[in-house]
Amino acid sequence: MLQVYNTLTRKKEVFKPLKEGEVSIYACGPTVYNMPHIGNYRTFLMADNIVRSLEYLGYKVKLVMNITDIDDKTIRDSKAAGMSLKDFTDKYTAEFFKGLDMLNIKRASAYPRATENIDSMIELTQKLIDKGMAYEKGGSVYYRISSFPDYGKLSKLDFDSIIIGASVDVDEYDKDNPRDFALLKTSTPEEIERGIYYESPWGKIRPGWHIECSVMAMNCFGPTLDMHLGGVDLIFPHHENEIAQSEGATGKPFACYWIHGEHLIVEGEKMSKSKGNVFTLPEIVGKYGGEVVRFMFLSVHYRKKLDYSDAFAENAKNNYLRLKETLENLEFSLESAENTDYPGDEEVLKILPELETQFREALEDDFNIPKALTVFKELSRTANKYLESEKNRHVLEKLYSLYRQFSDTLGLFSESGKKEIPTEVMRLVEEREAARKKKDWTVSDAIREKIKSLGYIVQDTKEGPNVKETE
């Protein structure tokens, strides 16, 4: 039975979808104004892990992740870059998708852009005005948070701390200073000159950040969805304001389960440009490889801070390579194994269902991926122990099938499989085998080094030489 930690109630709850067997998820995506750092991608990967886990558990999942392509930051930085807002945000949207591919993050069902949903934002704003929950001031439209008694229920904000009538124009502000926030902002003369405005009943405007997500989520799912995901930094004001806007307009719960991922820190400190410890994904992937970075993110539960360091990444790399080697050895052994019974077969076949149950239970425990990884490592140990003895093809197929189920659910080894070895390398392998048969170890070792210089290693097994690319 799946249990999910709900930020709204601050406890684990049994998950009950709105529609049996199906799950609707909205995840806050990137604000495309720069290269996303590794902390951003940890949150995007959290969404991917949740989707993969739900699919493994038998659910049909629809994930929608927005792209914020108009807000304070995109307008400010596109101007500094001397680019149009569209060209600027298109550039960083493309970088965002490249990063998803680096980490083998599956594509969401949809990636709506804020600029494609302006009409709906104007409609929602008008609805809130009609209900007395929003008002126009100086060409901008503000949400009256005192009109929503539940304001603060997600962030546990003290409603009495609200300053009645005070408003704020910036998208991000402190929880200790709750104010009426902007739904739509009057465009400045400079923004109008740059073409960054939309006609509305209140003049030339552009949207505030918070209304964008409310509209895109409801346009995709209707008034209520199963899960809303994001980083802990979005709980206030962003997600709090989403609830106020959406539930204020519809009178219905906006999201049943709010799921938030913790921060990524670097060697115990928060990432900041002044400390020089802000790393982009391409920097880290260039150093360790995309799947190693993914594995590193998998090793810490999404509700715990991930403390990044080179030592932590190196440890993740070593663990990843051991698991990958097991997969390659299974694939190699399957090529020559026959259906002959051997002692130990029954023991392995008995262990596999137990490991499958443990893996499932880990995912059902608030998407406990680190716990699932521990089960995966146990499967690897079981496989390696079996590979040391005589091998039954039927048992190997069972091992390989479960190994692949686990790795696919974790998003690992997507490019694995028997790769074509270059002809020159295979010729050298044959020459080395001939030297070994003659017990000419000097020639055999020299050929091994030549093969290594070409980027391959040779492992001598009972079944013959196993050739692999070096990492």
From Swiss-Prot:
Zn(2+) binds at C28, C213, H238, E242. InterPro entries: Cys-tRNA-ligase, Cys-tRNA-synt_Ia_DALR, Cys-tRNA/MSH_ligase, CysS_C, Rossmann-like_a/b/a_fold, tRNA-synt_1_cat_dom, tRNAsynth_Ia_anticodon-bd. Its cofactor is Zn(2+). Binds 1 zinc ion per subunit. It comes from the Archaea. It catalyses: tRNA(Cys) + L-cysteine + ATP = L-cysteinyl-tRNA(Cys) + AMP + diphosphate. Keywords: Aminoacyl-tRNA synthetase, ATP-binding, Cytoplasm, Ligase, Metal-binding, Nucleotide-binding, Protein biosynthesis, Zinc. GO terms for biological process: cysteinyl-tRNA aminoacylation. A motif ('HIGH' region) lies at residues 30-40. It is found in: Cytoplasm. ATP binds at K273. One of its GO terms (cellular component) is cytoplasm. Its EC number is 6.1.1.16. A motif ('KMSKS' region) lies at residues 270-274. Its main location: cytoplasm. One of its GO terms (molecular function) is cysteine-tRNA ligase activity. SUPFAM superfamilies: Anticodon-binding domain of a subclass of class I aminoacyl-tRNA synthetases (SSF47323), Nucleotidylyl transferase (SSF52374). The keyword Lipid metabolism does not apply. It is an enzyme of class 6 (ligase). Belongs to the class-I aminoacyl-tRNA synthetase family. This is Cysteine--tRNA ligase. It comes from Methanosarcina barkeri (strain Fusaro / DSM 804). The lineage of its organism: Archaea, Methanobacteriati, Methanobacteriota, Stenosarchaea group, Methanomicrobia. The gene is cysS.
